[in-house]
């Protein structure tokens, strides 16, 4: 009988050990933009190595809009965003009392790409892109020669981020003139690698997503120069930073739940993020902000300054110096 009691006690103790371990495990939950994902994932990997398993960081992809939905329900600590938070998302956070800290982490250019076998396009105007992507084009503009008569009678197959994507929001506002205003007959995915494969396998394919994904796949895609009114410009670190790649250059962000930031592991993660961003951003083919911008972001985080400097709107074609001015005013 004594032996039986000892065995039962030992089993209960063994069963309890994982429960205790789980209760002590520290987890940071992140979700949102597929564009910002490579940066945050790189930071998370390095941070977890440093912490030697003491902190787990999960990084999901549901698009900027999808990420903000989770963030505004209190399901995540940090939200990756490829555009500033908009009014309906601000209101959703207010509804349940979520305060957030807005931190720019890098600069990105939206790249427009075609299949490498496309030998008729090297550049496109904003007007031509609008003609392709505006809602009125749905099931009507289906061949390249309908966009420009100098181009061949080849089927036009379109690829782009889904409607929960901040990249979709930004592109439609910059090109069509209204956020989320787009034809619906295109292959959409929150996974940019799916879009890469689609364009790469279709001679008449055209699509758009963050420049970093092109930089990872230059042999599979052909980059298109964009004419915003001052001649065709290709996206590059230089043209994005100096603002000449217009209107498809933009800052990208993380948003931190203020309450979550009071947890030591979240505080340490954000400090690590901002300190290491200049190096890690470059490693994953994005464009780092100036040192001054990271310093301002670090100051904002240390003071727990909440809210957005963008007033609930996207700022199309914003230059780095414009971003710095907004940061300094906050």
Where is each model-derived feature located?
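Flexible loop/hinge segments at secondary-structure junctions
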Residues: 22-330
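A short, compositionally biased domain-edge/stem linker segment
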Residues: 16-22
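Bacterial N-terminal signal peptides
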Residues: 4-16
């Amino acid at each position: 009988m004594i032996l039986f009691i000892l065995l039962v006690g030992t089993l209960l103790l063994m069963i309890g050990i994982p429960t205790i371990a789980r209760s002590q495990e520290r987890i940071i939950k992140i979700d949102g933009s597929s564009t910002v994902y490579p940066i945050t994932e790189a930071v998370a990997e390095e941070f977890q190595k440093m912490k030697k398993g003491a902190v787990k960081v999960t990084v999901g992809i549901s698009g900027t809009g999808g990420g903000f939905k989770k963030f505004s329900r209190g399901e995540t600590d940090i939200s990756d965003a490829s555009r500033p938070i908009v009014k309906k998302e601000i209101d959703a956070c207010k509804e349940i009392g979520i305060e957030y800290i807005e931190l720019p982490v890098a600069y990105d250019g939206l790249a427009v790409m075609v299949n490498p076998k496309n030998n008729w396009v090297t550049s496109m105007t904003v007007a031509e892109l609008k003609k392709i992507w505006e809602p009125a084009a749905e099931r009507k503009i289906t061949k390249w020669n309908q966009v420009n008569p100098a181009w061949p009678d080849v089927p036009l197959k379109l690829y782009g981020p889904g409607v929960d994507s901040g990249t979709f929001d930004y592109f439609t506002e910059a090109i069509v003139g209204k956020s989320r205003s787009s034809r619906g007959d295109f292959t959409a995915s929150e996974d940019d690698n799916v879009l890469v494969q689609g364009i790469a396998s279709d001679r008449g394919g055209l699509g758009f997503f963050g420049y970093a994904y092109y930089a990872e796949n230059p042999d599979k895609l052909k980059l298109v120069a964009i004419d915003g009114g001052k001649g065709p410009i290709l996206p590059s670190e230089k043209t994005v930073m100096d603002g000449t790649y217009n209107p498809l250059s933009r800052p990208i962000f993380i948003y931190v739940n203020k309450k979550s930031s009071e947890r030591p592991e979240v505080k340490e993660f954000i400090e690590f993020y901002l300190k290491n961003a200049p190096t890690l951003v470059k490693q994953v083919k994005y464009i780092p902000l100036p040192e001054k911008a990271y310093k301002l972001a670090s100051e904002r985080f240390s003071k727990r300054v909440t809210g957005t400097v963008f007033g609930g709107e996207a700022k199309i074609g914003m230059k780095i110096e414009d971003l710095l001015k907004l940061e300094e005013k906050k």
